[in-house]
């Protein structure tokens, strides 16, 4: 039976590259982004035409639990989650507003909870599933001028380790990939 993967942050960069690879591997896809839905629809159409897969595009702000619930209800069964959506805020912590801190933590870390909380019951029922969270080397070593981003990615690392232990008896794999600096639009300032 064909596997179905949901990829957040799929309209560009790492998310787009992962979508292209999984389409090549024959996965049916649910592509998710917050702002670039027209670009995402074009990508979905391209992947369908090239690979003959089912590929749907969803607009969803993963920092909003109600949008996550609604999107997942539309998407249906998901076998693999690749949670790539993320944002950063560059600047001194002392200059950062609480709203900016919360936006980074909600988008990068709390969204892991929102997505997992909704997907885990169906995966436990099937006794199968994969959850993959995109982290960063900054989650392990920290980065000056990116305290919120570093904290959110460190949180993802701990979240992943704990959830992997919790879900291992249900045959659900939980992992994180901690990238270094990748040449994406998000990192153009480096």
Segments from the language model and where they lie:
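Active-site loop immediately N-terminal to the catalytic Tyr-X3-Lys motif
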Residues: 94, 141-147, 169-170
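Conserved glycine-rich Rossmann-like NAD(P)H-binding loop of the short-chain dehydrogenase/reductase
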Residues: 25-42
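Conserved glycine-rich cofactor-binding loop
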Residues: 11-12
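Active-site helix of classical SDR
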Residues: 116, 152, 160
């Amino acid at each position: 039976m064909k596997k179905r993967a949901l990829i957040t942050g799929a309209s560009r960069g790492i998310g787009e590259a992962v979508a292209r690879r999984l389409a090549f591997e024959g996965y049916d896809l649910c592509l998710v982004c917050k702002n670039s839905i027209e670009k995402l629809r074009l990508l979905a159409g391209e992947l369908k035409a090239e690979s003959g897969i089912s590929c749907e595009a969803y607009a969803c702000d993963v920092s909003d639990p109600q949008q996550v619930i609604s999107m997942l209800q539309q998407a249906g069964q998901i076998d693999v989650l690749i949670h790539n959506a993320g944002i950063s805020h560059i600047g001194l912590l002392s200059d950062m507003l609480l709203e900016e801190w919360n936006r980074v933590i909600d988008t990068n870390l709390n969204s892991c909870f929102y997505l997992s909380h909704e997907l885990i019951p169906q995966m436990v029922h099937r006794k199968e599933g994969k959850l993959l969270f995109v982290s960063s080397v900054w989650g392990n070593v920290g980065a000056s001028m990116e305290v919120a981003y570093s904290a959110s990615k460190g949180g993802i690392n701990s979240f992943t380790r704990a959830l992997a232990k919790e879900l291992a008896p249900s045959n659900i794999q939980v992992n994180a990939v901690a990238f270094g600096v990748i040449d994406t639009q998000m990192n153009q300032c480096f």
